[in-house]
Amino acid sequence: MPKFFAEITDTFGGEANYCWVHRFIIEASSMRGAVWKLTRETGYSFRMDYNTGDFRRYNVPRAAICMFIEWADDNIVDQYLNAKRI
């Protein structure tokens, strides 16, 4: 099953701030499925901001929070050992 890497962080002035960050490795059949699993895990409602194909940014409405998600290869999975697995 494909894996996805996601980061949820705060924003300042609309840009990612990384004052705090939560990282996730998600197993899902599609990127949309990965976002759905992350929505259930965190309780946030995400709205897509932009999509470059393999990389997407989502914002949480009425909150200074954003999420980045991308396809994860084995190098990324090995690099972030402290990322929560979903």
Show which residues each predicted segment covers.
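Short, mixed-charge low-complexity intrinsically disordered segments
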Residues: 44-86
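Hydrophobic beta-strand residues in large extracellular and virion-surface proteins
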Residues: 4-6, 26, 34, 38, ...
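Short intrinsically disordered coil segments
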Residues: 21-24, 39-43, 84-85
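A short, exposed loop/beta-hairpin motif centered on an aromatic-Gly-Thr core
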Residues: 17-32
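Generic structural motif
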Residues: 9-11, 29-31, 63, 72-74
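Intrinsic-disorder-associated interaction segments
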Residues: 1, 27-31, 58
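Short aromatic-glycine-(Arg/Gly/Cys) micro-motifs in beta-strand/loop hairpins
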Residues: 1-21
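A short, charged, amphipathic alpha-helix used as a generic interaction element across diverse proteins
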Residues: 29-53
